[in-house]
Amino acid sequence: MSKTAAQPRVGLYPGTFDPVTNGHLDIIRRACTLVDRLVIGVAINADKKPLFSLEERREMLEAECAKLSVGGEIVVRPFDTLLMSFAQEVGAGIIVRGLRAVSDFEYEFQMVGMNQKLDPGIETVFLMADPTCQAIASRLVKEIARLKGDVSHFVPAAVEGRLKAKFGVS
């Protein structure tokens, strides 16, 4: 597909981002090389009981994305609908997903099958996690922070500060 000014390539990177990690930012940076506009969909998922509010997660993402040197546009938007409905709403032709391990692939493979039934015109693109980010998972970062461990290798400094504030760590 060729780039045209009339039809920019729009990608959607959905997730909970509770909190945003260096792994997420690596995928965002690399996804921006594939599309003209990347929409980061911050999922409202009550089942996950996030540590950070939707507004806090959106703020962290916007602040960290503003620091990235990318050529395309990045937009952060919350969503609480079906992923494919949201993708259609934002005009995304590509859904971007990061893969860290085989277990990620098994889950994502099932999701692609379902999503293709809902809208076969939207492709899913998988980006392998950078080797330096393969072990990073938001839930593990939160657990390490809760136990007063060092998360500086896994999240940006501002996010580390917010984690420390949440868990009362100085």
Question: PLM features: residue spans?
Answer:
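Nucleotidyltransferase catalytic core that binds NTPs
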Residues: 1-170
